[in-house]
UniProtKB/Swiss-Prot annotation:
UniProt remark on domains: The TXY motif contains the threonine and tyrosine residues whose phosphorylation activates the MAP kinases.
Chain ranges of the Protein kinase domain: 21-314
Molecular function in Gene Ontology: ATP binding; ATP-dependent protein binding; MAP kinase activity; protein serine kinase activity
Motif residue range(s): TXY: 186-188
Gene: MKP1
Protein name: Mitogen-activated protein kinase 1
Organism phylogeny: Eukaryota, Fungi, Dikarya, Ascomycota, Taphrinomycotina
Protein backbone atom coordinates (compact mmCIF):
# COMPACT_ATOMS: atom_id res chain seq x y z
CA UNK A 1 0.00 0.00 0.00
CA UNK A 2 1.30 3.48 -0.84
CA UNK A 3 2.10 6.08 1.80
CA UNK A 4 -0.99 8.12 0.93
CA UNK A 5 -3.51 5.48 2.06
CA UNK A 6 -4.41 3.36 5.09
CA UNK A 7 -6.29 0.04 5.11
CA UNK A 8 -9.29 -0.80 7.32
CA UNK A 9 -11.76 -3.68 7.48
CA UNK A 10 -15.40 -2.61 7.30
CA UNK A 11 -18.15 -5.24 7.36
CA UNK A 12 -15.86 -7.78 5.70
CA UNK A 13 -14.70 -5.31 3.02
CA UNK A 14 -11.23 -3.84 2.70
CA UNK A 15 -11.45 -0.04 2.89
CA UNK A 16 -8.43 1.83 1.54
CA UNK A 17 -8.78 5.38 2.82
CA UNK A 18 -6.77 8.51 2.23
CA UNK A 19 -4.19 9.21 4.94
CA UNK A 20 -5.62 11.09 7.88
CA UNK A 21 -8.95 9.26 7.86
CA UNK A 22 -9.96 6.63 10.42
CA UNK A 23 -13.06 4.44 10.25
CA UNK A 24 -15.63 4.95 13.01
CA UNK A 25 -18.07 2.17 12.10
CA UNK A 26 -19.84 0.45 9.24
CA UNK A 27 -23.21 1.99 8.34
CA UNK A 28 -24.63 -0.30 5.68
CA UNK A 29 -24.01 -2.85 2.98
CA UNK A 30 -25.82 -3.38 -0.31
CA UNK A 31 -25.41 -4.48 -3.90
CA UNK A 32 -23.51 -1.23 -4.65
CA UNK A 33 -20.90 -1.84 -1.91
CA UNK A 34 -20.40 -0.65 1.68
CA UNK A 35 -20.78 2.64 3.59
CA UNK A 36 -18.93 3.59 6.76
CA UNK A 37 -18.57 6.66 8.92
CA UNK A 38 -15.06 8.04 9.33
CA UNK A 39 -13.24 11.02 10.76
CA UNK A 40 -10.34 13.11 9.56
CA UNK A 41 -7.93 13.10 12.52
CA UNK A 42 -6.00 16.00 10.99
CA UNK A 43 -9.01 18.33 11.37
CA UNK A 44 -10.58 19.30 14.72
CA UNK A 45 -14.06 20.53 13.74
CA UNK A 46 -16.61 19.11 11.31
CA UNK A 47 -14.27 16.24 10.64
CA UNK A 48 -16.73 13.36 10.21
CA UNK A 49 -17.79 11.99 6.83
CA UNK A 50 -19.64 9.07 5.30
CA UNK A 51 -17.47 7.06 2.92
CA UNK A 52 -19.17 4.97 0.27
CA UNK A 53 -17.11 2.27 -1.41
CA UNK A 54 -18.69 1.38 -4.75
CA UNK A 55 -17.47 -2.08 -5.72
CA UNK A 56 -17.33 -4.18 -8.91
CA UNK A 57 -17.90 -1.07 -11.01
CA UNK A 58 -16.72 -2.62 -14.25
CA UNK A 59 -18.24 -6.10 -13.90
CA UNK A 60 -21.21 -4.84 -15.97
CA UNK A 61 -21.70 -1.81 -18.20
CA UNK A 62 -24.89 -0.96 -16.28
CA UNK A 63 -22.93 -0.74 -12.99
CA UNK A 64 -20.17 1.33 -14.59
CA UNK A 65 -22.70 3.84 -15.93
CA UNK A 66 -24.49 3.90 -12.59
CA UNK A 67 -21.25 4.88 -10.83
CA UNK A 68 -20.47 7.55 -13.42
CA UNK A 69 -24.03 8.90 -13.25
CA UNK A 70 -23.88 9.07 -9.44
CA UNK A 71 -20.66 11.06 -9.28
CA UNK A 72 -21.64 13.43 -12.08
CA UNK A 73 -25.03 14.22 -10.56
CA UNK A 74 -23.64 14.63 -7.03
CA UNK A 75 -21.26 17.23 -8.45
CA UNK A 76 -24.00 18.96 -10.43
CA UNK A 77 -26.30 19.24 -7.38
CA UNK A 78 -23.55 19.91 -4.84
CA UNK A 79 -24.74 23.32 -3.67
CA UNK A 80 -28.33 22.54 -2.70
CA UNK A 81 -29.18 22.31 1.00
CA UNK A 82 -31.54 19.34 0.54
CA UNK A 83 -29.17 17.20 -1.53
CA UNK A 84 -26.30 15.31 0.07
CA UNK A 85 -22.91 17.00 -0.34
CA UNK A 86 -19.98 15.27 -2.03
CA UNK A 87 -16.71 16.30 -0.35
CA UNK A 88 -14.16 14.17 -2.15
CA UNK A 89 -13.63 11.13 -4.37
CA UNK A 90 -10.72 8.72 -4.53
CA UNK A 91 -9.38 6.03 -6.84
CA UNK A 92 -6.57 4.15 -5.12
CA UNK A 93 -4.82 3.02 -8.32
CA UNK A 94 -6.18 4.54 -11.54
CA UNK A 95 -4.17 2.11 -13.68
CA UNK A 96 -6.18 -0.88 -12.44
CA UNK A 97 -9.26 -0.18 -10.38
CA UNK A 98 -12.70 -1.70 -9.96
CA UNK A 99 -13.86 0.39 -7.02
CA UNK A 100 -14.42 4.00 -6.14
CA UNK A 101 -14.57 5.84 -2.82
CA UNK A 102 -17.01 8.72 -2.32
CA UNK A 103 -16.46 10.96 0.72
CA UNK A 104 -19.85 12.47 1.52
CA UNK A 105 -21.68 14.46 4.15
CA UNK A 106 -22.40 12.32 7.21
CA UNK A 107 -26.03 12.33 8.33
CA UNK A 108 -27.36 10.71 11.51
CA UNK A 109 -30.16 8.54 10.14
CA UNK A 110 -32.45 7.93 7.19
CA UNK A 111 -36.19 8.41 7.06
CA UNK A 112 -36.81 4.68 6.84
CA UNK A 113 -35.14 4.02 10.20
CA UNK A 114 -37.02 6.94 11.79
CA UNK A 115 -40.41 5.72 10.53
CA UNK A 116 -39.65 2.22 11.86
CA UNK A 117 -38.51 3.54 15.25
CA UNK A 118 -40.58 4.35 18.33
CA UNK A 119 -39.72 8.03 18.04
CA UNK A 120 -42.88 10.17 18.19
CA UNK A 121 -43.57 12.01 14.94
CA UNK A 122 -45.97 14.93 14.69
CA UNK A 123 -47.72 16.69 11.84
CA UNK A 124 -45.02 19.37 12.08
CA UNK A 125 -42.40 16.70 11.33
CA UNK A 126 -44.38 15.52 8.29
CA UNK A 127 -44.69 19.07 6.96
CA UNK A 128 -40.98 19.72 7.39
CA UNK A 129 -39.89 16.46 5.76
CA UNK A 130 -42.22 16.73 2.77
CA UNK A 131 -41.33 20.38 2.26
CA UNK A 132 -37.61 19.60 2.20
CA UNK A 133 -38.09 16.66 -0.18
CA UNK A 134 -40.02 18.90 -2.56
CA UNK A 135 -37.39 21.66 -2.36
CA UNK A 136 -34.68 19.20 -3.33
CA UNK A 137 -36.85 17.63 -6.00
CA UNK A 138 -37.73 21.01 -7.53
CA UNK A 139 -34.00 21.67 -7.92
CA UNK A 140 -33.40 18.21 -9.43
CA UNK A 141 -36.31 18.49 -11.87
CA UNK A 142 -35.24 21.98 -12.95
CA UNK A 143 -31.98 20.45 -14.23
CA UNK A 144 -34.04 18.13 -16.45
CA UNK A 145 -33.38 15.14 -14.19
CA UNK A 146 -35.72 12.50 -12.76
CA UNK A 147 -34.49 10.95 -9.51
CA UNK A 148 -36.47 7.71 -10.09
CA UNK A 149 -35.64 6.11 -6.75
CA UNK A 150 -37.18 8.29 -4.05
CA UNK A 151 -37.91 6.23 -0.94
CA UNK A 152 -37.40 6.69 2.81
CA UNK A 153 -33.98 4.97 2.83
CA UNK A 154 -32.70 7.50 0.26
CA UNK A 155 -33.69 10.45 2.46
CA UNK A 156 -31.04 11.27 5.06
CA UNK A 157 -32.00 13.05 8.30
CA UNK A 158 -30.21 14.77 11.17
CA UNK A 159 -31.46 15.30 14.72
CA UNK A 160 -32.38 18.89 13.83
CA UNK A 161 -34.74 17.44 11.16
CA UNK A 162 -32.62 18.66 8.24
CA UNK A 163 -33.28 16.33 5.29
CA UNK A 164 -31.17 15.53 2.24
CA UNK A 165 -31.85 13.43 -0.86
CA UNK A 166 -29.18 10.91 -1.83
CA UNK A 167 -28.47 8.10 -4.32
CA UNK A 168 -28.67 9.28 -7.93
CA UNK A 169 -27.48 6.06 -9.55
CA UNK A 170 -30.85 5.36 -11.21
CA UNK A 171 -31.57 8.93 -12.30
CA UNK A 172 -32.30 9.73 -15.94
CA UNK A 173 -32.79 12.77 -18.11
CA UNK A 174 -36.05 14.09 -19.45
CA UNK A 175 -35.80 14.12 -23.24
CA UNK A 176 -39.08 15.67 -24.20
CA UNK A 177 -40.71 13.88 -27.11
CA UNK A 178 -44.47 14.11 -26.82
CA UNK A 179 -46.01 16.63 -24.47
CA UNK A 180 -44.79 15.93 -20.96
CA UNK A 181 -43.45 12.52 -21.84
CA UNK A 182 -39.93 11.18 -22.08
CA UNK A 183 -38.15 9.84 -25.08
CA UNK A 184 -35.86 7.43 -23.27
CA UNK A 185 -36.34 5.45 -20.10
CA UNK A 186 -35.14 2.08 -18.88
CA UNK A 187 -37.23 -0.41 -16.95
CA UNK A 188 -34.85 -0.47 -13.99
CA UNK A 189 -36.55 2.15 -11.86
CA UNK A 190 -37.73 2.76 -8.32
CA UNK A 191 -38.33 0.22 -5.58
CA UNK A 192 -41.74 -1.33 -6.32
CA UNK A 193 -43.59 0.11 -3.32
CA UNK A 194 -42.84 3.68 -4.47
CA UNK A 195 -43.23 3.06 -8.20
CA UNK A 196 -45.75 5.17 -10.12
CA UNK A 197 -48.54 3.26 -11.91
CA UNK A 198 -47.54 4.72 -15.29
CA UNK A 199 -44.11 3.09 -14.87
CA UNK A 200 -45.56 -0.28 -13.90
CA UNK A 201 -48.10 -0.20 -16.72
CA UNK A 202 -45.67 1.15 -19.35
CA UNK A 203 -47.66 4.22 -20.31
CA UNK A 204 -46.90 5.60 -23.75
CA UNK A 205 -44.83 8.29 -22.05
CA UNK A 206 -43.95 9.45 -18.55
CA UNK A 207 -42.50 12.45 -16.84
CA UNK A 208 -41.44 14.23 -13.64
CA UNK A 209 -44.74 13.04 -12.19
CA UNK A 210 -43.18 9.65 -11.39
CA UNK A 211 -41.14 11.28 -8.60
CA UNK A 212 -44.22 13.08 -7.23
CA UNK A 213 -46.00 9.72 -6.90
CA UNK A 214 -43.06 8.52 -4.78
CA UNK A 215 -43.40 11.63 -2.58
CA UNK A 216 -47.07 10.74 -2.09
CA UNK A 217 -46.14 7.22 -1.02
CA UNK A 218 -43.64 8.69 1.46
CA UNK A 219 -46.25 11.09 2.90
CA UNK A 220 -48.70 8.20 3.34
CA UNK A 221 -45.96 6.16 5.01
CA UNK A 222 -45.28 8.99 7.45
CA UNK A 223 -48.99 9.25 8.28
CA UNK A 224 -49.39 5.51 8.83
CA UNK A 225 -45.85 4.57 10.00
CA UNK A 226 -45.76 1.75 7.43
CA UNK A 227 -45.45 1.39 3.63
CA UNK A 228 -48.70 2.40 1.94
CA UNK A 229 -48.66 0.16 -1.15
CA UNK A 230 -46.70 -2.87 0.05
CA UNK A 231 -47.15 -5.16 -2.94
CA UNK A 232 -45.50 -8.58 -2.78
CA UNK A 233 -45.17 -8.71 -6.57
CA UNK A 234 -46.04 -6.74 -9.70
CA UNK A 235 -49.74 -7.74 -9.84
CA UNK A 236 -50.25 -7.39 -6.09
CA UNK A 237 -48.71 -3.90 -6.22
CA UNK A 238 -51.19 -2.82 -8.89
CA UNK A 239 -54.11 -4.38 -7.04
CA UNK A 240 -53.20 -2.53 -3.83
CA UNK A 241 -53.15 0.74 -5.76
CA UNK A 242 -56.54 -0.03 -7.35
CA UNK A 243 -58.03 -0.85 -3.92
CA UNK A 244 -57.19 2.66 -2.67
CA UNK A 245 -57.46 4.79 -5.82
CA UNK A 246 -60.26 2.84 -7.46
CA UNK A 247 -60.25 1.15 -10.85
CA UNK A 248 -58.80 3.37 -13.61
CA UNK A 249 -61.21 4.75 -16.18
CA UNK A 250 -61.08 4.05 -19.91
CA UNK A 251 -59.23 7.30 -20.61
CA UNK A 252 -56.34 6.14 -18.41
CA UNK A 253 -56.44 2.55 -19.66
CA UNK A 254 -56.05 3.78 -23.26
CA UNK A 255 -52.64 5.27 -22.36
CA UNK A 256 -51.21 1.86 -21.43
CA UNK A 257 -48.92 0.32 -24.05
CA UNK A 258 -49.49 -3.31 -23.13
CA UNK A 259 -52.66 -4.86 -24.55
CA UNK A 260 -52.54 -7.63 -21.93
CA UNK A 261 -52.33 -5.05 -19.12
CA UNK A 262 -55.31 -3.22 -20.60
CA UNK A 263 -57.28 -6.48 -20.73
CA UNK A 264 -56.34 -7.34 -17.15
CA UNK A 265 -57.57 -3.99 -15.80
CA UNK A 266 -60.80 -4.19 -17.80
CA UNK A 267 -61.43 -7.65 -16.32
CA UNK A 268 -61.30 -6.32 -12.76
CA UNK A 269 -64.46 -5.43 -10.83
CA UNK A 270 -65.11 -1.69 -10.69
CA UNK A 271 -63.77 -0.36 -7.40
CA UNK A 272 -64.54 3.09 -5.94
CA UNK A 273 -61.85 5.40 -4.61
CA UNK A 274 -61.34 5.01 -0.86
CA UNK A 275 -61.44 8.31 1.11
CA UNK A 276 -58.10 9.01 2.77
CA UNK A 277 -60.00 10.31 5.80
CA UNK A 278 -61.09 6.72 6.48
CA UNK A 279 -57.53 5.41 6.23
CA UNK A 280 -55.97 8.23 8.28
CA UNK A 281 -58.87 9.52 10.45
CA UNK A 282 -56.65 11.64 12.71
CA UNK A 283 -54.53 13.27 10.00
CA UNK A 284 -54.48 16.96 9.17
CA UNK A 285 -57.10 17.48 6.40
CA UNK A 286 -54.58 19.57 4.45
CA UNK A 287 -52.14 16.63 4.54
CA UNK A 288 -54.85 14.39 3.09
CA UNK A 289 -55.63 16.92 0.39
CA UNK A 290 -51.97 17.07 -0.64
CA UNK A 291 -51.84 13.26 -0.54
CA UNK A 292 -54.81 13.16 -2.89
CA UNK A 293 -53.01 15.52 -5.29
CA UNK A 294 -49.82 13.43 -5.21
CA UNK A 295 -51.38 9.97 -5.47
CA UNK A 296 -53.39 10.71 -8.60
CA UNK A 297 -53.50 7.81 -11.05
CA UNK A 298 -53.23 9.92 -14.19
CA UNK A 299 -49.78 11.59 -14.22
CA UNK A 300 -51.14 14.51 -16.26
CA UNK A 301 -53.44 15.38 -13.35
CA UNK A 302 -50.80 14.85 -10.66
CA UNK A 303 -49.49 17.91 -8.83
CA UNK A 304 -46.03 19.27 -9.74
CA UNK A 305 -43.24 20.19 -7.30
CA UNK A 306 -43.92 23.90 -7.73
CA UNK A 307 -47.65 23.42 -7.13
CA UNK A 308 -47.06 21.15 -4.14
CA UNK A 309 -44.76 23.71 -2.51
CA UNK A 310 -47.64 26.23 -2.69
CA UNK A 311 -50.15 23.81 -1.15
CA UNK A 312 -51.83 24.99 2.09
CA UNK A 313 -50.30 22.05 3.99
CA UNK A 314 -46.83 23.52 3.47
CA UNK A 315 -47.73 27.21 3.83
CA UNK A 316 -45.83 27.49 7.12
CA UNK A 317 -42.59 26.61 5.28
CA UNK A 318 -43.16 27.93 1.76
CA UNK A 319 -40.80 30.73 0.73
CA UNK A 320 -40.12 31.13 -3.02
CA UNK A 321 -36.83 32.89 -2.24
CA UNK A 322 -35.54 29.74 -0.54
CA UNK A 323 -36.69 27.29 -3.22
CA UNK A 324 -34.15 27.81 -6.01
CA UNK A 325 -33.90 26.10 -9.38
CA UNK A 326 -30.70 24.71 -10.85
CA UNK A 327 -28.91 27.20 -13.08
CA UNK A 328 -27.77 24.58 -15.58
CA UNK A 329 -29.37 21.59 -17.28
CA UNK A 330 -27.57 18.30 -16.69
CA UNK A 331 -25.98 16.69 -19.75
CA UNK A 332 -26.78 12.97 -20.06
CA UNK A 333 -24.70 12.60 -23.23
CA UNK A 334 -22.52 9.95 -21.58
CA UNK A 335 -25.47 7.53 -21.56
CA UNK A 336 -24.77 6.84 -25.26
CA UNK A 337 -21.30 5.44 -24.49
CA UNK A 338 -21.10 1.65 -24.91
CA UNK A 339 -17.45 0.98 -24.09
CA UNK A 340 -16.58 0.10 -20.48
CA UNK A 341 -13.06 1.43 -21.10
CA UNK A 342 -14.47 4.80 -22.14
CA UNK A 343 -16.63 4.88 -19.01
CA UNK A 344 -13.57 3.96 -16.91
CA UNK A 345 -11.64 6.88 -18.39
CA UNK A 346 -14.59 9.23 -17.83
CA UNK A 347 -14.72 8.24 -14.14
CA UNK A 348 -10.98 8.94 -13.80
CA UNK A 349 -11.42 12.31 -15.51
CA UNK A 350 -14.39 13.24 -13.30
CA UNK A 351 -12.48 12.37 -10.11
CA UNK A 352 -9.44 14.36 -11.24
CA UNK A 353 -11.57 17.35 -12.28
CA UNK A 354 -13.48 17.35 -9.00
CA UNK A 355 -10.31 17.24 -6.93
CA UNK A 356 -9.03 20.20 -8.88
CA UNK A 357 -12.20 22.18 -8.22
CA UNK A 358 -12.31 21.38 -4.49
CA UNK A 359 -8.60 21.72 -3.72
CA UNK A 360 -8.15 17.97 -3.19
CA UNK A 361 -6.04 17.62 -6.33
CA UNK A 362 -4.14 14.40 -6.87
CA UNK A 363 -2.55 13.31 -10.09
CA UNK A 364 -4.74 10.87 -12.02
CA UNK A 365 -3.03 9.78 -15.19
CA UNK A 366 -5.09 8.58 -18.12
CA UNK A 367 -5.07 4.80 -18.35
CA UNK A 368 -3.90 5.25 -21.91
CA UNK A 369 -0.78 6.97 -20.55
CA UNK A 370 0.06 4.42 -17.85
Amino acid sequence: MDSKHSVFNVMGQEFVLQKGYEVIKGLGKGSYGVVCSAKNIEVEDNNKVAIKKITNIFSKKMLAKRALREIMLLQHFRNHKNITTLYDMDIVDPSKFNELYLYEELMQANLNSIIRSDQPLTDAHFQSFIYQILCGLKYIHSANVLHRDLKPSNLLINADCKLKICDFGLSRGISVNQGQGTEYMTEYVTTRWYRAPEVMLSFQSYSKAIDLWSVGCILAELLGRKPFFKGSNYVDQLNQIFCILGTPNENIISKIKSASAQSYIRSLPTLPKMPYSKIFPYANPDALDLLNCLLTFDPYDRISCEEALEHPYLIIWHDPNKEPVCSEQFDFGFEAIDSIEEIRQMIINEVSRFKGLTGNQKLYHSISNT
